[in-house]
Amino acid sequence: MRVVLLCRYDGSGYHGFQIQPNNNTVQEEIEKALKKINKKDIRVYMSGRTDSGVHAYGQVLHFDTELNIPNEAWKKALNANLPADIRIFGVTTSNEDFHVRYNSTRKTYHYKLYIGQNVDPFLLNYVGQHKYNFNFEKAKKTLNYFIGEHDFSSFCSKNSSVEDKIREIMFSYRSEEHTSELQSPAMI
């Protein structure tokens, strides 16, 4: 049976998603949880990798298993065996023709940049910081060079099984202003 997961994680304490020797990774934690449930090693496949310290709001994964467990029970069992910074939010099954990497049609990335000297400590792990004046117009103009279809062959390994290396990059921009004003209830 092929089980498909929707996973969310805070990557602050991990060296990326993919297993690496001598480094703690998200994939390693998920595979350890699956081993506890399945009583044997289970390989997890991902739709894409994240780098060290990067978070995921909707990473799609799959694995194959002989266990026939209801979807909600998979979710409950996995979350019970995963660290609190990795959560499974959705579970479904699929036929064996589906592969998260090869059937993925889109990936969305969010980059958050805090402009200013005093970033809120609760945002530190979730934003990049630029301490001085930032030219938004120049940044948007530069990002326009990336928009459109591009050939990513030079980023693939020689043995890559991916046939179509053309990808389309789209861009959207949103600005939000945050206040550093402290709002806290009185403590007694």
Predicted segments, located by residue:
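Structured-RNA-binding interfaces characteristic of tRNA pseudouridine synthases
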Residues: 1-180, 184
